[in-house]
Regions:
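Sec-dependent, cleavable N-terminal signal peptides
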Residues: 1-5
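N-terminal catalytic scaffold of extracellular/periplasmic and nuclease hydrolases
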Residues: 6-181, 185-204
Length: 204
């Protein structure tokens, strides 16, 4: 009986671990270091460790490099080994590859949108969704979680999709073509009409 006890304990721990894994998370955070690959992370670790140890070559620890799990993914897109923010963010947001410059659209037909994980959580699970960026809020990386465009340069249309997304919160740099072609309401007005409280800084 005593010999079997470790197996029983191990099975119980495994079951408890599985149950913890299957629990619905209260919050989900996705952080994207745009253009940050293994080389950039390793350089930052060496810089941090060396500066903290008076110039002695030392590998430092970053807040996320001590996480218990790590993974890696391919970064090429459907047509290029050197992709851009639009296609790579599409892969992160939807699990699908597309062409460089395209946001959440099928690369073969250009008329089939890909649903993002943020949209799925918002519609199917009633999660509240926020998108926060240090770049323009209609830049390809943040836009990949709420927009669907055949070119990342459709900034005004991306801004309209932001307003139509129904997501609860957005924060980032100004819309890049806030007035569009000048024939319709600007992106601030479109967002306000959709119920958003639009707040800008002095810099706009």
């Amino acid at each position: 009986a005593s010999a079997a006890q470790p197996d029983a304990v191990g099975a119980a721990e495994e079951e408890n671990g599985l149950l913890d894994f299957l629990k619905k998370p209260k919050y989900i955070f996705l952080f994207i270091g745009d253009g940050m690959g293994t080389a950039q992370i390793q350089s930052a670790r060496f810089y941090k460790g060396t500066t903290e140890n008076n110039g002695a070559i030392t590998e430092g620890e970053l807040s996320f490099t001590s996480f218990p799990e790590v993974g890696s993914v391919t970064t090429y897109d459907s047509t290029s080994f050197c992709p851009d923010s639009a296609s790579t963010a599409t892969s992160i947001a939807t699990g699908n590859k597309t062409e460089s410059g395209v946001i959440n659209m099928c690369p073969w037909t250009r008329d089939v949108p890909y649903e993002t994980i943020a949209e799925k959580l918002h519609k199917q699970k009633n999660y509240k969704v926020g998108v926060v960026s240090t770049v323009n809020i209609d830049h390809a990386t943040p836009a990949a979680f709420y927009a669907h465009q055949n070119t990342r340069k459709n900034y005004y249309q991306i801004g309209v999709e932001l307003a139509n997304s129904g997501f609860e919160y957005f924060a980032g740099g100004e819309f890049q073509k806030v007035n569009g072609d000048g024939t319709g309401p600007n992106n601030h007005e479109v967002a306000a009409q959709a119920g958003y409280n639009v707040v800008t800084t002095q810099a706009g």
